[in-house]
From Swiss-Prot:
Main location group: mitochondrion
Cellular component terms (Gene Ontology): mitochondrial inner membrane; proton-transporting ATP synthase complex
Its job: Subunit a, of the mitochondrial membrane ATP synthase complex (F(1)F(0) ATP synthase or Complex V) that produces ATP from ADP in the presence of a proton gradient across the membrane which is generated by electron transport complexes of the respiratory chain. ATP synthase complex consist of a soluble F(1) head domain - the catalytic core - and a membrane F(1) domain - the membrane proton channel. These two domains are linked by a central stalk rotating inside the F(1) region and a stationary peripheral stalk.
Disulphide bridges: none
GO aspect biological process, one term: proton transmembrane transport
Complex and partners: Component of the ATP synthase complex composed at least of ATP5F1A/subunit alpha, ATP5F1B/subunit beta, ATP5MC1/subunit c (homooctomer), MT-ATP6/subunit a, MT-ATP8/subunit 8, ATP5ME/subunit e, ATP5MF/subunit f, ATP5MG/subunit g, ATP5MK/subunit k, ATP5MJ/subunit j, ATP5F1C/subunit gamma, ATP5F1D/subunit delta, ATP5F1E/subunit epsilon, ATP5PF/subunit F6, ATP5PB/subunit b, ATP5PD/subunit d, ATP5PO/subunit OSCP.
Name of the featured protein: ATP synthase F(0) complex subunit a
Transmembrane region(s): 12-32, 68-88, 97-117, 135-155, 164-184, 189-209
Membrane topology: Multi-pass membrane protein
Amino acid sequence: MNENLFTSFATPTIMGLPIVILIIMFPSIMFPSPNRLINNRLVSTQQWLLQLTSKQMLSIHNNKGQTWALMLMSLILFIGSTNLLGLLPHSFTPTTQLSMNLGMAIPLWAGTVFLGFRHKTKASLAHFLPQGTPVFLIPMLVIIETISLFIQPVALAVRLTANITAGHLLMHLIGGATLALMNISPTTALITFIILILLTILEFAVALIQAYVFTLLVSLYLHDNT
């Protein structure tokens, strides 16, 4: 059966019911809790990476911001593992859905903004009007700063969606070209296959980098409001 180019981005269903919730929960099964006092090398490596990432992200925060440590680490683990599992053939990547990414970005952004208005009301309101602004520019700047504030979660979600979707589409196109060239020009097919392997390795890096960038931007929004 011939598949559409965007088939892998459609929400999978069973008997007409969406199973995206099960797919989203699946990565948590991949990280079982160790039942031994001494961890193996894989668990030790995971813990080292988490400690390194948390140290980099939380070093700029005060005590109020550091209470979000568990949330930020859970977020980067979830997005990273979901992106990596989406690289498996014929699999579904939830982070290619803009609705899901908005569902993550908007509550996290709203939480940081609410925290800022609650604990730093004057400083949060001061962001809407830079110091030394001419009087005739005040209405325009307030509108611009308000729009830039509300566009933050949209930019956060669109960035993740666009990067993951673009990589998957490029892999799909190069893979299709490789299959089409196998009977026409084996040498060219071999070259495109090597390019596909290199692109796949790059996509593994992109999957982790995008998870880090998404979480880092949430951390910066939190820092601006605490």
